[in-house]
Amino acid sequence: MHHRLTSLLLLWVCLGAGISGAMAQDAVRACGTVSLALPMADAVVALRTEQHVDLVLRAGGGTETGLDALGTHTVDLALCSRNLTPADRADYPQAQLKTAPVGLQLLSLAVSRDVWVGGLRALSAEQARGIYEGRINNWKEVGGPDLRIRLFMAERGRGQWEIFAQWLYGEIRKAPMWNGSKVKGIEEARNTLEFTPGSCALLPPAFTDYRNLFALSILDGAGRPVQPTVANAAQGKYPLSRPLLLVTDDNPAGPVKVVVDFMVSERGQELIKRYGYIGLEELQAAQARK
């Protein structure tokens, strides 16, 4: 229910229904990855009633769309789910792009109970690539039970798919189209896994309860299983993760700084963690243990 309400709120914000009359002079415009837009949509009411700042989230797009809008000064904040590259900065030489980390998105290859009970505990990149490309169709081919594999994947261009494609192919553009069963988001993926035999989908580890849903480890180059933990992601050992960043043109000031400060505050971080993301405190603690 929470995710359905948030989707409605996001639509409401994008249409500008929360702005009385014309857009307020100090409204902060933002767009980019949906992964970050969802928790920020939950912050709209608090920002307006307590900080007197209107946050307007523009519909559609992803990280690239957000950066393009920021670089052309049509938004004040780009919502990004990857680190900036030299090419990003070269594309907008007039912009002084500054980043503010707000969390980490950590995903796992989650499987249904029957796959886990059948003995599967980990997959290599080559095995996962074979499943994605349809060359591996039964779990017994990768050490699991004799069950048909049912892989559910987010649409191409969605955040979860991009993390998966980057891991398997190095560059997103090299990944083939996904023509199999699709899920629209984390909640749908979780429900589908729970009730579909032989199923696999991408889920935050926090959403796997080890009663009905189970997170697989990933085999590294030496064949060693690497668990989907914050510590392993922070140390660069676990590949299915990416940063969540707010990007501004120059150091944030005025209403933009209010929004950034809110998202890194305790209240903003609770919104980040509500969606299964890793908050800054936990991430920094893991990095300190390197």
Predicted features and spans:
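Bacterial N-terminal signal peptides
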Residues: 7-18
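Positively charged n-region of N-terminal signal peptides that target proteins for export
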Residues: 1-5
